[in-house]
Amino acid sequence: MKDIHLKNSLKLSLVTLSRESEDKFISKFEKVIKLVNKISNFEVQINFNANKKKISTLREDKVEFSLSIEAIKKLSNSFLDGYFSSPKILE
């Protein structure tokens, strides 16, 4: 994998790593990419009929507890106006 793709991935993730951690990340990232490439070589025929279910067998939606905006703000220092800001992707 080209170094530029790895550098861009690290930049977009907003993660700062030491050189040792970066080397570990690159090694693991390359393994994942190789596995994805290997999986993409399989020929799979999709059978939509096999996935059909009656509506009555589907689960009901339940309203569950969620984090408050204040708790979410604490997860990142790039939270602005209700959104997480991210690096510019398109140049």
Curated annotation (Swiss-Prot):
One Gene Ontology biological process: regulation of translational fidelity
Signal sequence residues: none
Family the UniProt entry places it in: Belongs to the GatC family.
Upper classification of the organism: Bacteria, Pseudomonadati, Spirochaetota, Spirochaetia, Spirochaetales
UniProt key word Ligase: yes
Coiled coil: none
Function of the molecule: Allows the formation of correctly charged Asn-tRNA(Asn) or Gln-tRNA(Gln) through the transamidation of misacylated Asp-tRNA(Asn) or Glu-tRNA(Gln) in organisms which lack either or both of asparaginyl-tRNA or glutaminyl-tRNA synthetases. The reaction takes place in the presence of glutamine and ATP through an activated phospho-Asp-tRNA(Asn) or phospho-Glu-tRNA(Gln).
InterPro entries noted in UniProt: Asp/Glu-ADT_sf_sub_c, GatC
Keywords: ATP-binding, Ligase, Nucleotide-binding, Protein biosynthesis
Protein name per its UniProtKB record: Glutamyl-tRNA(Gln) amidotransferase subunit C
Keyword DNA-binding: no
Annotated GO MF terms: asparaginyl-tRNA synthase (glutamine-hydrolyzing) activity; ATP binding; glutaminyl-tRNA synthase (glutamine-hydrolyzing) activity
Enzyme class, first EC level, given as a word: ligase
UniProt source species: Borreliella burgdorferi (strain ATCC 35210 / DSM 4680 / CIP 102532 / B31)
Enzyme Commission identifier(s): 6.3.5.-
TM region positions: none
Top-level taxon: Bacteria
Reactions listed under catalytic activity: L-glutamyl-tRNA(Gln) + L-glutamine + ATP + H2O = L-glutaminyl-tRNA(Gln) + L-glutamate + ADP + phosphate + H(+); L-aspartyl-tRNA(Asn) + L-glutamine + ATP + H2O = L-asparaginyl-tRNA(Asn) + L-glutamate + ADP + phosphate + 2 H(+)
NCBIfam families assigned to the protein according to its UniProt record, in alphabetical order: gatC
